[in-house]
Amino acid sequence: MIKIEKLTQSYCLNDINCTLPSGKLIGIMGANGAGKSTLLKTISGILPLKQGEIWFDNQPLSKMNSTEKSQHIAYLAQNTQIHWDLSVYDVIALGLATPLPKEKERSKIQTFSEKFAVTHLLDKPFQQLSGGEKARV
């Protein structure tokens, strides 16, 4: 579960409060400049918290070290300079917050791939995916 309390960040996020249940796929929608990316970057720990707190399973983000964060968070920006020659597996591995030992990496990527129904694509070159498949990855 992710719980956001009184999150204020920059000019675009003001007193955000919500609870996101575990195991659910959540969409964040809004106009350009509404703060979608700022919210995701703050949740993922890329941007430091200015005000408020984010909790992962009752553990505050502000108290987590990078290893603990990597157990809860992965972030891959939508528009990046993806290495087109990489497999889907490798692209997902790039999104991990910190490098993991190979066995833990495999396990985490397997879990993600099952959750987003892309397991059958793991060995496929990223450049060969359809638009919808790329979006899920």
Protein language model features and the residues they cover:
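Conserved catalytic motifs of ABC-family nucleotide-binding domains
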Residues: 63, 79-93, 98-103, 125
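The feature captures the beta-strand-to-loop junction immediately N-terminal to the Walker
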Residues: 29-31
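Conserved ABC ATPase signature
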Residues: 125-129, 133
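Conserved Walker
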Residues: 37-38
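Helix-to-loop junction immediately C-terminal to a conserved catalytic motif
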Residues: 44
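Conserved ABC ATPase "signature" region
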Residues: 106-121
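Conserved beta-strand
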Residues: 4-7, 11-24, 52
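Conserved ABC transporter NBD signature motif
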Residues: 52-60, 69
